[in-house]
């Protein structure tokens, strides 16, 4: 038998399956999925107080930006900039708040929030400032359609 070496046994095993990426359950509950960029899933937070996006890299078991390799880090910043530009163009906001906190939800996610001087929390952070307000279905659908167009989202 060609290639056979007496006394040596070789067993071929299938490579281990990579764990499937899944969105953290709390993020799934609190958001609407609007599409995917090359690295990150783009979500809208279910709170009409602010135009508020989340970008969640579709990578398993990543909790910090530094857990991504350098190419993915650069890609994430490119996608954050794309989200920020879209929000700024659509809302004419005064300031973008961009943050990756992860104190409550360990899965890496980046908040991109459009702020206006005089909004309900200005100039403080939005978290816990006022109770969340549900989106008007028609308004959020229009906003999502505009975001998809501006960001060239696949979804």
Kindly give the residue locations of the regions a language model identified.
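A cross-taxon signal for low-complexity, glycine/charged-rich
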Residues: 6-7
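HIT superfamily nucleotide-processing domains
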Residues: 10-155
């Amino acid at each position: 038998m060609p290639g056979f070496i007496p006394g040596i046994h070789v067993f071929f095993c299938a490579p281990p399956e990579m764990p499937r990426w899944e969105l953290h359950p709390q993020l799934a509950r609190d958001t609407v999925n609007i599409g995917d960029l090359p690295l990150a899933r783009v979500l809208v937070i279910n709170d009409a107080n602010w135009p508020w996006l989340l970008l969640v890299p579709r990578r398993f078991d990543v909790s910090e930006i530094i857990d991504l390799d350098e190419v993915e880090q650069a890609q994430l910043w490119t996608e954050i900039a794309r989200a920020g530009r879209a929000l700024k163009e659509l809302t004419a906001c005064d300031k973008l708040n961009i943050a990756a906190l992860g104190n409550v939800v360990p899965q890496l996610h980046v908040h991109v929030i459009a702020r206006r001087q005089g909004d309900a929390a200005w100039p403080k952070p939005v978290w816990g400032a006022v109770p969340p307000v549900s989106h008007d279905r028609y308004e959020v659908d229009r906003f999502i359609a505009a975001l998809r167009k501006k960001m060239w989202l696949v979804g």
